[in-house]
Every structure is written in structure tokens, then in C-alpha cells.
Regions:
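Structural recognition of the beta-strand scaffold that forms the well-ordered cores
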Residues: 2-5, 51, 88-92, 106, ...
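Solvent-exposed loop and edge beta-strand segments that line ligand/cofactor-binding
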Residues: 43-52, 99-106, 173-180, 198
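Structured C-terminal helix/loop/strand segments within mature extracytoplasmic catalytic/sensor domains
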Residues: 173-219
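Active-site-proximal binding-pocket segments
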Residues: 76-77, 81-140
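Active-site-adjacent helix/loop patches that line small-molecule binding or acyl-intermediate pockets
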Residues: 1-86, 109-113, 117-121
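Solvent-exposed loop/turn segments at secondary-structure junctions
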Residues: 10-11, 57, 96-99, 123, ...
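Active-site Gly/Thr loop motif
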Residues: 86-90, 136-190
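Charged/polar, low-hydrophobicity segments characteristic of intrinsically disordered regions
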Residues: 1-6, 89-102, 145-159, 219
Length: 219
């Protein structure tokens, strides 16, 4: 589970990571993970420090490839994308040959909303339990604290937003370049944002105040 909270403890210098990415012949399949462990600095003891890096989700995809009956790609398409009715998307291939997990996937806004609803509905979509509710609860929990203002679960961020001098909880999926799925449990609201801008800090601060006044808390 540490790889899903960005606490694998693997530390590889950027120049060495570039060498690994360029050595495509020797990082196919599970050899990618082997290369990570061969080239990392010594891994510290638990609890390990949070480090936001592409290595940890790459290992997660390798684990998925090892445990599902088919390939990770086939499993994701059959058990998630098809059941969410997501047909138009781009999910690039990693150098390992597996689906790229750190970044790079592209979907329509309407399909990003479906991912948000899947989480909001505790793993259910169209009446079918696609992901166990207990896993969704843990994934969106504050399992570690990368900073004073943000906590982190299994690839989900959590922070507190200020709305007219009142606090509200917010869970987010944050993608490169300003791709967001915001979940506001108290208001029962899912918001999707797409953009091509670097720097997500201002949006995280301003969006709740502009959207949530129109959606009072449901409890």
C-alpha cells in the first residue's frame, strides 16, 4: 500500500531515471520494477517520507498486472472503462509495455465526471459495485500528510476549502496541466476542470468559493 501513498521509499536520481527510460530493451514487463530496486538508494524503514513521483504508480500498475487474471490493460478496459461507458479515451503505453500510470491518459470531461461519481457513490455505478466501498473509503482517507494544508490517500488528495468563512472538506484527483476532479461530500457535488495551464495552486483555492455558494450543504 505504500506505493499508493507515494511512500515506497525508492529514491533514484533524475539522471539515473533518464537512463532507465532510455534502456527500453531491459525494462519490459516486470524488469521495470527490478530496475527500480537495483538503482535506488537504500530504502528506509517505515514510516517512510512522502515523495510525489512516477515510480510509485508504475509499481502499482506492475502489481495489478501480476494479480489480475488477464493483463492490466484488459482488466481496466473490461472491469472499469466499459462499465463506466467510457469509449473515447487515450491511455498511452509505458516503456514497460503496461498502461502508463503516472500521467498521460486523456478522457472527455463527461467521462471524468463518471470517475467522480464512482467515488461519490462508494464504488457503485449504474447499480453495480465496481470497486469495494471499503477500498474507496480508505483511498480517499487522509493516510499521510505531505504538507500542512494537504493530506493524501491512495492517489487522492484531501484539503479544507474556505467558503464564506466556513470550512468544507474537499477530495481531489489532480492531473498534470490542471486536470481536476473535485469531490465535495457535504454539498454532494462533483466538479471537473480541464485546462492546459501549469500551476494548480490558484485553482484549488478559488474554485470552491466560486462554485459552492450555489450548493448549500445537504446535511
Amino acid at each position: 500500500a505504500d506505493v499508493m501513498t507515494m511512500r515506497s521509499g525508492i529514491r533514484i536520481p533524475q539522471n539515473v531515471q533518464r537512463e532507465i527510460r532510455s534502456d527500453t530493451a531491459n525494462v519490459q514487463g516486470k524488469h521495470q520494477v527490478q530496475m527500480f530496486f537495483e538503482r535506488t538508494a537504500p530504502i528506509g524503514s517505515v514510516p517512510r517520507e512522502f515523495k510525489y513521483q512516477g515510480i510509485d504508480p508504475a509499481i502499482t500498475m506492475q502489481v495489478l498486472e501480476a494479480v489480475v487474471p488477464e493483463s492490466a490493460e484488459a482488466f481496466l478496459k473490461k472491469e472499469l472503462l466499459q462499465k463506466l461507458n467510457v469509449s473515447q479515451f487515450h491511455w498511452p503505453e509505458d516503456i514497460s509495455g503496461l498502461p502508463k500510470s503516472a500521467a498521460g491518459s486523456s478522457m472527455r470531461s463527461r467521462d471524468m465526471v463518471k470517475w467522480g461519481l464512482l467515488v461519490r457513490q462508494h464504488g457503485q455505478f449504474n447499480g453495480e459495485q465496481l470497486i469495494p466501498a471499503a477500498f474507496i473509503k480508505r483511498a480517499t482517507s487522509a493516510l499521510c500528510a505531505p504538507s500542512d494544508t494537504n493530506s493524501y490517500g491512495y492517489f487522492f488528495w484531501q484539503h479544507t476549502a474556505m467558503i464564506e468563512e466556513m470550512q468544507t472538506t474537499c477530495t481531489t484527483c489532480r492531473g498534470a496541466g490542471g486536470q481536476f476532479i473535485f469531490l465535495f461530500p457535504k454539498q454532494d457535488v462533483v466538479v471537473v476542470v480541464t485546462s492546459h495551464n501549469k500551476g494548480m495552486g490558484p485553482l484549488l483555492k478559488t474554485l470552491p468559493g466560486r462554485v459552492l455558494p450555489f450548493f448549500p450543504p445537504t446535511d
